């Protein structure tokens, strides 16, 4: 695995030839004893798998590593009272300055500073637990983003496959149009229009190819590889219909509320603040969070149902296209249809195949979005 930062050689080199064979891996966020040898080997190979994304993000994502380092240096073990006490002491010092001031400007300045310090103690500073939750939420959102990026990568692959088959049909149509022109059954304008369609098809293929590469680089860099690395990216998992059938917004709501990071953070800050007006603000935030969790869960559930319906429709479309393809194959073999007509049927079949796969991936993504809300992560 070619990692992006903090490289270290994990075995001793015995001679130059042996050194050249030693894998170089990035420093992970966790100590070596945190995982088994087999688990580390799986993460350090040159293969990216969907079910590894969460662990890869945790160990090798630079944002996560930076958050962990910062937390360990500045916030670990720090509670709200530590910060509150610090700023309240500052407020008391400003109060003394205000009492000792000999002019109105100095008095007002000191009183303002005291008020700001009390406000800082009441609302701005966060304790270690709050920051820890924020870091966990940020990490989980990165995992969610990685899942979505990998899903998009494979959806784009399917779109490219369909575009390439469509281009083959378009090119055949250009040749057929030129042949018709030779027998005065097509005009020069018809030929130019067909050629323009071919140029458009080439432009679409180029655009999709670039999008695929951009998406690939985004995926591998956020999981620890260098931008120019070429790890094997394994296929996406199948849709688990049993998991889908178990989705139940009414039953899942309590768990989603219990896990929701934003709700936990706002609830803790509401308990920490002492200023009456700020307490009202945080209490309202908590109430809003509670309501929004239910809305988000129901919206995500509806998206899952819509994605499932679209997938089922695409499956039926593929069955129809398969029958048309079978018929066209027989007709082409006996010479009853032209090559262009055969390519039309073939292009339609490939479009139906890739369309079904895109809908499957969209369903998988919708299911993941629902599950993330249950796990406490809202967009």
Regions found by a protein language model. Give the residues of each.
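Bacterial Sec-pathway N-terminal export signals of envelope proteins
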Residues: 26-129, 133, 140-146, 150, ...
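Short, solvent-exposed, mixed-charge loop/turn linkers that connect secondary-structure elements
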Residues: 209-251, 367-379
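Coiled-coil heptad-register positions
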Residues: 68, 75, 82, 89, ...
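Extended, charged, solvent-exposed helical/coil segments
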Residues: 257, 276-286
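Sec-dependent N-terminal signal peptides of Gram-positive bacterial secreted proteins and lipoproteins
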Residues: 1-28
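Helix-turn-helix repeat elements of alpha-solenoid scaffolds
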Residues: 123-130, 164-172, 229-230, 278-280
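Charged, solvent-exposed structural "stalk/scaffold" segments
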Residues: 67-70, 74, 120, 138, ...
């Amino acid at each position: 695995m070619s990692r992006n930062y903090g490289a270290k050689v994990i075995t001793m080199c015995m001679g130059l030839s042996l050194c050249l064979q030693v894998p170089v891996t990035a420093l992970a966020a966790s100590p070596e004893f945190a995982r088994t040898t087999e688990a580390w080997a799986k993460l350090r190979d040159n293969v990216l798998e969907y079910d590894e994304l969460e662990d890869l993000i945790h160990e090798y994502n630079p944002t996560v590593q930076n958050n962990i380092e910062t937390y360990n240096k500045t916030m670990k073990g720090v509670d709200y009272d530590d910060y509150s006490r610090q700023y309240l002491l500052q407020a008391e010092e400003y109060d003394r300055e205000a009492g000792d001031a000999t002019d109105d400007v100095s008095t007002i300045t000191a009183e303002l500073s005291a008020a700001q310090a009390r406000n800082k103690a009441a609302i701005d500073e966060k304790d270690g637990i709050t920051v820890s939750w924020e870091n966990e939420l940020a990490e989980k959102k990165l995992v969610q983003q990685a899942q979505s990026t990998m899903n998009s990568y494979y959806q784009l692959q399917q779109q490219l496959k369909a575009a390439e088959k469509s281009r083959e049909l378009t090119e055949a149509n250009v040749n057929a149009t030129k042949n018709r022109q030779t027998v005065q059954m097509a005009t020069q304008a018809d030929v130019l229009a067909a050629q323009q369609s071919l140029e458009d098809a080439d432009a679409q293929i180029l655009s999709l190819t670039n999008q695929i590469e951009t998406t690939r680089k985004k995926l591998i860099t956020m999981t620890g590889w260098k931008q120019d690395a070429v790890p094997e990216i394994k296929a996406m998992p199948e849709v688990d219909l049993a998991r889908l059938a178990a989705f139940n917004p009414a039953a899942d709501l309590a768990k989603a509320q219990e896990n929701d990071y934003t709700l936990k953070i706002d609830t803790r800050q509401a308990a920490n603040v002492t200023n009456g007006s700020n307490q009202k603000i945080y209490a309202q935030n908590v109430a809003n969070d509670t309501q929004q969790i239910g809305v988000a869960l129901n919206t995500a559930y509806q998206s899952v149902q819509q994605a499932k319906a679209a997938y089922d429709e695409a499956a039926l479309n593929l069955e129809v296209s398969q029958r048309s393809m079978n018929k066209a194959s027989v007709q082409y073999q006996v010479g009853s249809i032209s090559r262009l007509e055969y390519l039309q049927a073939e292009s339609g079949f490939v479009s139906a195949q890739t369309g079904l796969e895109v809908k499957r991936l969209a369903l998988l993504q919708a299911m993941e979005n629902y599950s993330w809300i249950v796990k406490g992560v809202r967009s």
